[in-house]
């Protein structure tokens, strides 16, 4: 374990200067893709995505780790309500696991949403991660099998990051379910996936953008998303090895946002350029920009993930 920690610290120190700004990235406006009410502009690493300094040291995204059995998720303990806001993670390899705030874990006693970005180092001990409930009304004695539920949409992620308030998260989920008039039988955020019409629309969007990403150069590390006259948000990661395994769940989250509140694209390029310039000009500008419009996750001073959104007042 000490051997691994030494090399992980070395990796962080060696890469600490490579922050997620225009120094290392560029926004590929010429490769923007648009389908119906969603426009996506890829963000690329200069000089290609490139292999990380040491592939064995790079964290594995949660969805990949779950599918490969590198990590398991269980309830923290009994049905006591003090356990609602925690999940227990156990790693089963020598690789760290990267968990992103806004990812949804389905099952257990109720569906949950990860509160903040976290890196789980390999350990034989239990590790506990803070979560919020996104399934009001079910806290069952019987546990369902845990599964991966994609990223939440941008509105719900904003409420999570700006309030960390369980009641406001439930209200936002309820608002979305009511506004969408989804054919479902619960108050769960994921219940919209029971609606056949929703699934058909979502699949149409997903196939279009998934195909575009599959056909472009593999140096993309993030993207900015637009609908109507506004920027929905952006997600940028430290390398292709983190971005591509999370591409599908990220797309599902942004597509869900557009299905619920998207409008025909009217936003011109200049406001997008100003938005991205403020975000990527340099580290100081980035820190100031995300103060009320997103978050930056760092590990040892090294930026792992930048997520932004359009500031709006959360549901009260």
Identify the meaning behind each predicted range:
Residues 1-21:
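Bacterial Sec-dependent N-terminal signal peptides
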Residues 19-92, 96, 102-121, 126-316:
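Intrinsically disordered, low-complexity segments enriched in small/polar residues
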